[in-house]
A protein has these predicted regions:
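Conserved catalytic cores of very large enzyme subunits
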Residues: 2-750
Length: 750
C-alpha cells in the first residue's frame, strides 16, 4: 500500500493499493442537501479575466468565428510554452494552461488528416505550412488517408449519398474520457509505475498481434504521462506528486484534460465526472481554514473559464454537422450512489453557479445526473438555473446506474461511459429514413437517381401496402446495418493505428472495456411514415422513370409524440430491430455494440440529402432532431410528447436517447417559485417512467426571432440554447440552422 503526505485526512484503503478513484470518492465525499444560500459571487479577479475573455470572444466573432490559427507548429503536449488569457492579468489566473501559446488560437492538428488541417486554415484565410504539407503527405500517413485508401466503392457511395454520414474519418473520433482525476489523486510518477507494471505483465511471452499492439499502446501511454509532466513544468507546476490542496487538485486535473485537447481534436472531448471528487479537496481546505467559500468558487469559475476557451480548427463540412463550434466538454453533477446516498455536494452547486457568475455558455456541457430521489433543494436550484440560462441538460441516473455503476461520465452529448474503465468507438449515425426510401425504390437513391443500395425489387404499386413495405424495409435495414458496422470497423482500426489517443488512454485502465457506438437519424420520420402506410392511404408520386419521388397521404394517422401506442410501438420495434441487426455483426476489438437516437445539428444535413417521406415531410428539408417527434406532430402538449419518448427502452439504446424540448415560460407558471416547482414535477414524472435524457429550453419564439435579426444586441452575445445533445450560442448557428430551431415546437402548455 502506498501513502503520501498529501493524503492526510483522507479515509479508505483500496484506493491506496490500486488505481480506484471511485473508492476514494465513496470513502471521503460529504453529501449536501441544503440550498444555494452558501454560494459566493464572482471575485474581482474573475470579473477581470472574464471581461478580458469576452472581449476576445467578441473579436473572434467579428473575424468570422476564428480569432487566430496555427500554421507552422504541429500541436503536441510540449509544442508551446506557457500561455495566458491576458499577460497583464496572468497573476490573477487560479487555473492556468492553454491549448496553444495564445487564448482562443486554434492548433494545427494534422494526424487526423492533413487535408482537413489545411482546409481549416484556408477557410479562414490562413496559409498552411508547405513544409508540414510535405511531411504529412510524403513521409507520414494520416488517419484520413488510411481510411480512404481502404474504403470499398460501396462504402464511398453510402458516404456520398449520406445514408451513412458524419463519420469520424475526417476528424478525431473523440468520446474517450480520460480519468483526469487520477493526476490529482496519485500524481504522474505513481501513474507511470502502475502502467509499467501493466507493461511487464502484458502477455505470457507469446507475441500475438493483440499482445504486440497492447505493448506498443502502453509504451505510448507511458510516454504521454512523461510528456504531461513537462507540459506542466512550463507553468511552474510539479504534477509528479499528488495534489496537496484544492487549488492543486483543480490544476492537476485540468492539466490531464489539457493533455487530451492538445493531442486530439475529437468531436467530443468530455471533462467527465469531477465535481464530487474536487469537493473532497475543497471541503478539507474549508475545514482546516486554508480556503474560503469565495476562493473555492473562484477556483471553479476559473476552471470553467478554461473549459469555455477550448477550440479546434474545423472544416465547413464538419461545421454543418456540428454547428456552433461545440467541443462537448461535458461535465456532470449530481447522481445517487450505489449505496443510496446522494452524490450531490456543494461543488455541484458551484459548477451550476458558474452560469450565474459568468453568464450562460455552451461549454462545459453541464449535465445533471437526475433522479427524483435527489435532494429537493438541488432539484429546485438546477431547475432555476435551467429556466434562467437554458444551458443545462438532464440524464436519468436511475436507468444508467444499473449498467454503468455510480462513477460513470457522459462522454459526448448523452452517452455514458465508466470513468477510467472504458472507452467508446464513436460511430456517427445511419439514415434510417433514407433507408426506407431505398426499400421503396429498390436501392436507387432518390436524389442522385443512382443505384447505391442493393438492387432489390422496388415497390411499383400506386398505393403503399404495409405488408409489402415492412419486409422490404427490414431487408434494406439489414444491408445498411452490415455496411455501417464494416465502415466503422475500418475507421476504428485506422484511428487506433494512426491517431491513437495515448494521453487519454494513459488515464484509463489498461484492461479496458470497449463499446461500439452506432446511431440512428430520421427516427420519428420512419415511425410516422410506417404509421401513415399502416393507418392511412399513401399514394406514390413517380417521375418519368418510375422512381418514387413524392407521397400523398389520404386520411389521418397516429403520430409519434402524442402518447399514442399505435405510433409509439412502431418506434420501439424500430429501435430493437436495428440494434439486433448491429449486434449480430463482428465488431472491432470485440467491442460491445450499442446505438443511440441522436443527431446533433446534423438533422439539417441529413434532411438535405433525403427526399420526400410517406409521413408528409417535404423533400430535402430538415429531420426532427434525435428522438424528438416530427415537426408539427405533437398535438397533445409537452407531457404527451415526453410520454412517447419515455417508452423507448434505454437498454436498447445504451449510447443514449436525446430529447430536446422548448417550453414557453408562461407554460411553467407566473412566478419563479411556481416555475421551478413545475419544472421539477415534469422532470420527476418523465424520468420516473424510465426516460433517458432531456434538454430544457425555457423561452419563447419571439426571442429567437429577435436574436436572429439583431445578433449585435449585447443581450444575445452569450444567449445559449440546448439543441440535440449539447448547448450552443444561438447567434453562432447558421441562418438555416436558426430557422430549423425556430420551426420546432415551443410548448405553450404542459
Amino acid at each position: 500500500m502506498i501513502n503520501f503526505e498529501q493524503w492526510e485526512g483522507f479515509e479508505g484503503r483500496i484506493w491506496k493499493e490500486e488505481v480506484n478513484v471511485r473508492d476514494f470518492i465513496q470513502k471521503n465525499y460529504t453529501p449536501y442537501d441544503g440550498d444555494e444560500s452558501f454560494l459566493a459571487g464572482p471575485t474581482e479577479a474573475t470579473d477581470k479575466l472574464w471581461g478580458a475573455l469576452q472581449k476576445l470572444q467578441k473579436e473572434e466573432r467579428a473575424k468570422g468565428g476564428v480569432l487566430d490559427m496555427e500554421t507552422e507548429v504541429v500541436s503536441s503536449l510540449t509544442a508551446y510554452g506557457p500561455g495566458y488569457i491576458d499577460e497583464t492579468l496572468k497573476d490573477l489566473e487560479q487555473i492556468v494552461g492553454l491549448q496553444t501559446d495564445k487564448p482562443l488560437k486554434r492548433a494545427f492538428m494534422p494526424y487526423g488528416g492533413i487535408k482537413m488541417a489545411e482546409q481549416a486554415c484556408t477557410t479562414y484565410g490562413y496559409q498552411p505550412s508547405e513544409e508540414l504539407h510535405k511531411i504529412f503527405t510524403d513521409y507520414t500517413r494520416t488517419h484520413n488517408q488510411a481510411v480512404f485508401d481502404a474504403y470499398t466503392p460501396e462504402m464511398k457511395a453510402a458516404r456520398h449519398t449520406h445514408i451513412i454520414t458524419g463519420l469520424p474519418d475526417t476528424y478525431g473520433r473523440g468520446r474517450i474520457v480520460g480519468d483526469y482525476r487520477r493526476v490529482a489523486l496519485y500524481g504522474i510518477d505513481a501513474l507511470i509505475r502502475f502502467k509499467q507494471e501493466d507493461f511487464a505483465n502484458c502477455g505470457d511471452g507469446t507475441m500475438t498481434d493483440d499482445v504486440i499492439r497492447l505493448r506498443e499502446e502502453i509504451a505510448r501511454q507511458i510516454s504521454a504521462l512523461k510528456g504531461m509532466k513537462k507540459m506542466a513544468e512550463a507553468y511552474g507546476c510539479d504534477i509528479s506528486q499528488p495534489a496537496k490542496n484544492a487549488k492543486e487538485a483543480c490544476q492537476w486535473l485540468y492539466f490531464g484534460y489539457l493533455a487530451a485537447i492538445k493531442t486530439q481534436n475529437g468531436a467530443a472531448m468530455s471533462v467527465g465526472r469531477i465535481s464530487t471528487f474536487l469537493d473532497i479537496y475543497i471541503q478539507r481546505d474549508l475545514e482546516n481554514g486554508t480556503l474560503t467559500e469565495s476562493q473555492a468558487q473562484e477556483l471553479i469559475d476559473h476552471m470553467v473559464m478554461k473549459f469555455r476557451m477550448v477550440k479546434f480548427a474545423r472544416i465547413p463540412s464538419y461545421n454543418q454537422l456540428f454547428s456552433g463550434d461545440p467541443v462537448w466538454a461535458t461535465l456532470e453533477v449530481g447522481g445517487i450512489g450505489m449505496d443510496g446516498r446522494s452524490m450531490v455536494t456543494k461543488n455541484c452547486y458551484r459548477f451550476l453557479h458558474t452560469l450565474e457568475n459568468m453568464g450562460p455558455a455552451p461549454e462545459p456541457n453541464l449535465t445533471v445526473l437526475y433522479s427524483s430521489a435527489l435532494p429537493e433543494n438541488f432539484k429546485k436550484y438546477a431547475a432555476k438555473v435551467s429556466i434562467n440560462t437554458s444551458s443545462v441538460q438532464y440524464e436519468n441516473d436511475d436507468v444508467m446506474k444499473p449498467v454503468w455503476g455510480d462513477d460513470y461520465s457522459i462522454c459526448c452529448c448523452v452517452s455514458a461511459t465508466q470513468t477510467g474503465k472504458e472507452m467508446q468507438f464513436f460511430g456517427a449515425r445511419a439514415n434510417l429514413a433514407k433507408c426506407l426510401l431505398y426499400a421503396i425504390n429498390g436501392g436507387v437513391d432518390e436524389k442522385s437517381h443512382e443505384q447505391c443500395g442493393p438492387n432489390y425489387a422496388p415497390i411499383t404499386s400506386e398505393y403503399l401496402n404495409y405488408d409489402e413495405v415492412l419486409p422490404k424495409y427490414v431487408q434494406m435495414l439489414d444491408w445498411l446495418a452490415g455496411l455501417y458496422v464494416n465502415v466503422l470497423n475500418l475507421i476504428q482500426y485506422m484511428h487506433d493505428k494512426y491517431y491513437y489517443e495515448e494521453a487519454e488512454m494513459a488515464l484509463i485502465d489498461t484492461d479496458v472495456r470497449r463499446t461500439f457506438a452506432t446511431g440512428i437519424a430520421g427516427f420519428s420520420h420512419v415511425i410516422d411514415s410506417l404509421s401513415a402506410i399502416k393507418y392511412a392511404k399513401v399514394k406514390v408520386v413517380r417521375d418519368e422513370t418510375g422512381l418514387a419521388t413524392g407521397y400523398e397521404v389520404e386520411g389521418d394517422f397516429p403520430k409519434y409524440g402524442n402518447d399514442d401506442d399505435r405510433a409509439d410501438e412502431i418506434g420501439v420495434w424500430l429501435l430493437r430491430t436495428f440494434l439486433e441487426m448491429i449486434k449480430k455483426r463482428h465488431t472491432y476489438r470485440n467491442s460491445e455494440a450499442t446505438t443511440s437516437i441522436l443527431t446533433i445539428t446534423s438533422n439539417v444535413v441529413y434532411g438535405k440529402y433525403t427526399g420526400a417521406l410517406p409521413d408528409g415531410r417535404a423533400a430535402f428539408t430538415p429531420f426532427a432532431p434525435g428522438a424528438n417527434p416530427s415537426y408539427g406532430a405533437e398535438q397533445n402538449g409537452l407531457l404527451a410528447s415526453l410520454n412517447s419518448v419515455a417508452k423507448l427502452p434505454y437498454h436498447w439504446a445504451l449510447d443514449g436517447i436525446s430529447n430536446t424540448q422548448t417550453i414557453n415560460p408562461e407554460a411553467l407558471g407566473h412566478s419563479e417559485e411556481e416555475r421551478k416547482e413545475n419544472l421539477v414535477q415534469v422532470l420527476d414524472g418523465y424520468f420516473d417512467q424510465g426516460a433517458h435524457h432531456l434538454n430544457v429550453n425555457v423561452f419563447g419564439k419571439e426571442k429567437l426571432l429577435d436574436a436572429m435579426e439583431h445578433p449585435e444586441k449585447e443581450e444575445y452575445a452569450n444567449f445559449t440554447i440546448r439543441v440535440s445533445g449539447y448547448a450552443v450560442k444561438f447567434i453562432d448557428l447558421t441562418r438555416e440552422q436558426q430557422m430549423d430551431v425556430i420551426s420546432r415546437t415551443c410548448h405553450a402548455a404542459l
